[in-house]
C-alpha cells in the first residue's frame, strides 16, 4: 500500500501518456488509492481530458470513475462539459444500487463545486447536470450537498 501511494507522488505527470492509463488504473485497489492518485498525479497530467473521457465511461469501473471525478475537481481549468458525464455516472451507480454510489456522488459534488464556483456559465452547466438527477439516495446526496455548497 505504501509503495503504491509513494509511486503516485514520485511519478512524473508530464510523462504519463494515454498508453499508460490502463497501467495506472489497474493500480487503483481502493478508494484511498484512487483519491490519492487524483491528488498526487492525475490532476496534473497534460492528457487529463483524455483520461477523464476514458475513465468516466460506464464500463470503466467505479474506482477509475471516482479517481477521474476527484482529479477533475483539482485540475486548473475544469471543463463544464464534464458535468453531464459526472451526473450520468452518479445516476448509473444509483440506479444499479452499487454500494459505492455515494462515493461517486461525493466525487461528482467535488467536481460540481469546482466548476460551479468559477463563474456563472459553469454554475448553470452544473445546475443543469445536477438537475437531471432523480431522488435515489446517491442522487439526493448530490442535491443536498450542492444546495449549501453552491447556495442553490
Mark where each language-model region is.
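Alpha-helical scaffold domains
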Residues: 1-152
Amino acid at each position: 500500500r505504501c509503495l503504491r501511494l509513494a509511486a503516485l507522488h514520485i511519478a512524473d505527470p508530464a510523462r504519463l501518456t494515454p498508453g499508460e492509463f490502463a497501467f495506472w488504473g489497474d493500480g487503483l485497489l481502493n478508494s484511498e488509492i484512487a483519491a490519492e492518485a487524483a491528488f498526487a498525479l492525475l490532476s496534473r497530467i497534460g492528457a487529463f481530458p483524455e483520461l477523464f473521457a476514458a475513465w468516466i465511461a460506464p464500463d470503466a469501473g467505479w474506482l477509475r470513475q471516482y479517481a477521474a471525478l476527484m482529479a477533475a475537481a483539482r485540475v486548473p481549468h475544469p471543463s463544464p462539459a464534464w458535468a453531464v458525464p459526472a451526473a450520468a455516472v452518479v445516476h448509473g451507480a444509483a440506479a444499479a444500487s452499487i454500494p459505492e454510489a455515494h462515493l461517486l456522488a461525493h466525487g461528482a459534488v467535488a467536481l460540481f463545486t469546482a466548476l460551479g464556483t468559477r463563474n456563472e456559465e459553469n454554475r448553470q452547466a452544473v445546475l443543469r447536470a445536477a438537475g437531471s438527477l432523480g431522488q435515489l439516495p446517491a442522487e439526493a446526496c448530490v442535491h443536498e450537498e450542492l444546495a449549501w455548497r453552491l447556495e442553490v
